[in-house]
Each structure stands twice: as structure tokens, then as C-alpha cells.
Swiss-Prot record:
GO terms for cellular component: axon cytoplasm; BLOC-1 complex; BORC complex; cytosol; lysosomal membrane; mitochondrial intermembrane space; mitochondrial matrix. This is Biogenesis of lysosome-related organelles complex 1 subunit 1. Keywords: Coiled coil, Cytoplasm, Lysosome, Membrane, Mitochondrion, Transferase. Component of the biogenesis of lysosome-related organelles complex 1 (BLOC-1). Component of the BLOC-1 complex, a complex that is required for normal biogenesis of lysosome-related organelles (LRO), such as platelet dense granules and melanosomes. May also play a role in intracellular vesicle trafficking. As part of a BORC-like complex may play a role in lysosomes movement and localization at the cell periphery. Associated with the cytosolic face of lysosomes, this complex may couple lysosomes to microtubule plus-end-directed kinesin motor. Acts as a protein acetyltransferase. May negatively regulate aerobic respiration through mitochondrial protein lysine-acetylation. The keyword Membrane applies. The gene is bloc1s1. It holds the Pfam family GCN5L1. Its main location: mitochondrion. One of its GO terms (biological process) is neuron projection development. It catalyses: L-lysyl-[protein] + acetyl-CoA = N(6)-acetyl-L-lysyl-[protein] + CoA + H(+). Residues 1-25 form a coiled coil. One of its GO terms (molecular function) is protein-lysine-acetyltransferase activity.
Amino acid sequence: MLSRLLKEHQGKQTERKEAQEKRRKDAIAAATTLTEALVDHLNVGVAQAYVNQRKLDHEVKTLQTQAAQFAKQTTQWISLVENFNQALKEIGDVENWARSIEKDMRIIATALEYVYKGQLQPSAS
């Protein structure tokens, strides 16, 4: 009887150990699965952040290139406008010069006219 109780006790202990070992393995498997799921979830976020960062870097590079082109084009436009402004000033200078010459020519023509008329009047008398 004692031997039978000992065997039963040992059998129950073995069953408990096996059940406990099974639960421990199940807990380890569940913890591993949870850890993998958390890592995968975090990796998705990190991967998305990396992709977004690459897109932003590309956009920044494109924007810098376009800004440089715009600055160059703006400089060219400013140069053209300054050249045009200078040409307009020169045209204005030529116009003023032409008016001055025209005024001088009228004065000379008037003086010559008076001289011519002055020469005609004494000889006609």
C-alpha cells in the first residue's frame, strides 16, 4: 500500500512536472510570438519612417536644384532688365542730343535767315 501510494505520488509529480514543463514551453512560445509581433510592428514603423525620410531627402534635393535654377534665371532676368533700362536711358540721351542739335540748327537757320534777309534789303534799296 505504501509502495502504491509512493508510485501514485511519483506518477502525479511526474504528470505535474510534465504539465508544468508544457505550460513553460507554451509560455516561452507565446512570449517569443509576442516579441516577434512587437518587433515586426516596430519594424514596420521604422521602415515607413525610413521610406518617408528617403522621400523627404529626394524632395529636398529636387527643391534645392529648382531653387538654384530659379535663382540663376532670376539673375538673368535682372541682367536683361538692367540692360533694357540702360538701352532706354541711351535712347533718352540720344533723343535729348537730337533735340539739342535740332535747337542749335534752328538757331543757326534763323541766324542765316536774318543774315540772308539783311543782305537782300540793302541791295534792293
